């Protein structure tokens, strides 16, 4: 997946209660960027093509090439679906 697409998908859920998870090609695992207690605070596409996300207790950097799905698990009452 393209890094610009991922940042565009994540921008609407910044500061919302819920969990963002990424599914990677070739694995059955999903990686949680944040948890329900620590909402996503920011996302940006870095000049090197990697995606950087931030939350209260830190930040993450990942290569978007292997991402096949972005999931948004909204807190009850927040709306939103499973896949962005």
Region locations from a protein language model:
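Anionic N-terminal interaction surfaces
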Residues: 1-39
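Detector for intrinsically disordered, low-structure N-terminal pre-sequences
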Residues: 4, 19, 50, 66-69
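Short linear proline/tyrosine/threonine-rich motifs used for host-factor recruitment
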Residues: 22, 33, 51-53, 61-63
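Structured surface patches comprising rigid loops and adjacent beta-strands/short helices at the edges
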Residues: 36-43, 59-77
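A generic structural signal for beta-strand entry/edge sites
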Residues: 48-50, 76-79
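Short acidic DE-rich linear segments
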Residues: 81-84
């Amino acid at each position: 997946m393209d890094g610009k697409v991922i940042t565009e998908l994540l921008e609407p859920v910044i500061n919302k209660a819920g969990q963002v998870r990424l599914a990677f090609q070739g694995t059955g695992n999903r990686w949680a960027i944040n948890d329900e207690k620590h909402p996503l605070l920011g996302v940006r596409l870095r000049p090197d093509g990697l995606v950087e996300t931030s939350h209260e207790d830190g930040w993450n950097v990942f290569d978007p090439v292997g991402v096949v799905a972005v999931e948004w698990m909204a807190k009850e009452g927040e709306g939103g679906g499973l896949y962005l």
